[in-house]
Amino acid sequence: MRVGLVGWRGMVGSVLMQRMVEERDFDLIEPVFFSTSQIGVPAPNFGKDAGMLHDAFDIESLKQLDAVITCQGGSYTEKVYPALRQAGWKGYWIDAASTLRMDKEAIITLDPVNLKQILHGIHHGTKTFVGGNCTVSLMLMALGGLYERGLVEWMSAMTYQAASGAGAQNMRELISQMGVINDAVSSELANPASSILDIDKKVAETMRSGSFPTDNFGVPLAGSLIPWIDVKRDNGQSKEEWKAGVEANKILGLQDSPVPIDGTCVRIGAMRCHSQALTIKLKQNIPLDEIEEMIATHNDWVKVIPNERDITARELTPAKVTGTLSVPVGRLRKMAMGDDFLNAFTVGDQLLWGAAEPLRRTLRIILAEK
């Protein structure tokens, strides 16, 4: 299968390439690399020679492919996808961008949760597969065991989202902000006799100063947070909050009888792991040990963390999870509102299960089925 790769140099694309090398995906395909800026230079070698870089906007070149995997972003998809389909191309389009997620012709792909839907689509002519919103995918990886049994009446998700979700430049800016804050009070920190209130005042002054680096976030994130992600919708939700309900229900195949999902999406100073505090209204009172068993056995990556302080502090954090495929779930307990209310907290890497991993796994599924 000739597979075109677009956006492979960006942050998500780089993680995708790393995972495809680790899983030897390149052994199974003929890779064709595309670029929007460096056409004609040698393509990267991920275990086999791929010739030269091709023009990512050349419809005739793209038409020669059996599949395209793109991490190039929404504007690329908006320009190229309709033109390619209108030109008669009938290959598989596998996309990280949000542009096509809610299109009827597209399946939001997360195979540990909706493999049956993916296989049905492949066997019935679906050719467009799109990775889901990062928080949605990570939430479903964590709680798939409850959703597949139809046990969730509604859910509220309060998110703690990493800088990586906003892009590579935002990650750099977060680190720069941390450095500027440290530099502003480094001499005071080195002096044990200095007043922490004086240090705190200086930190606040630094964060509020006009020279503080905020070109990307617009406001300080280090030492602070931003309780808004993406644009505003008419009902007062942010678009990120809207995605939780519509995308999760599409992945679960529940558009006709959706589970209400809503909450507040917040950007915090983590690098690349999103965390979520979840309030789950169950349809019935289920013993906690049974809930834990359902969650833990749903897929190979979810991990139930006992609701104890020390192991939670060690295992249920971005620092522990970053760079791994593990999706730990903890703080599992019944709530004061009633025994049919469940509290949970989960963490996952935004660039792996939140972005790159579903794309490469979709390619492997297509290869296996075809």
UniProtKB/Swiss-Prot annotation:
UniProt record similarity statement: Belongs to the aspartate-semialdehyde dehydrogenase family.
Any one biological process term the GO annotation gives: threonine biosynthetic process
Catalytic activity: L-aspartate 4-semialdehyde + phosphate + NADP(+) = 4-phospho-L-aspartate + NADPH + H(+)
Binding residues for NADP(+): R9, G10, M11, V12, T36, S37, Q72, S164, G165, P192, Q350
Name the UniProt record assigns to this protein: Aspartate-semialdehyde dehydrogenase 1
Keyword NADP: yes
Modes of activity regulation: Inhibited by S-methyl-L-cysteine sulfoxide in vitro, via the formation of a covalently bound cysteine at the active site Cys-134.
Pathway, per record: Amino-acid biosynthesis; L-lysine biosynthesis via DAP pathway; (S)-tetrahydrodipicolinate from L-aspartate: step 2/4; Amino-acid biosynthesis; L-methionine biosynthesis via de novo pathway; L-homoserine from L-aspartate: step 2/3; Amino-acid biosynthesis; L-threonine biosynthesis; L-threonine from L-aspartate: step 2/5
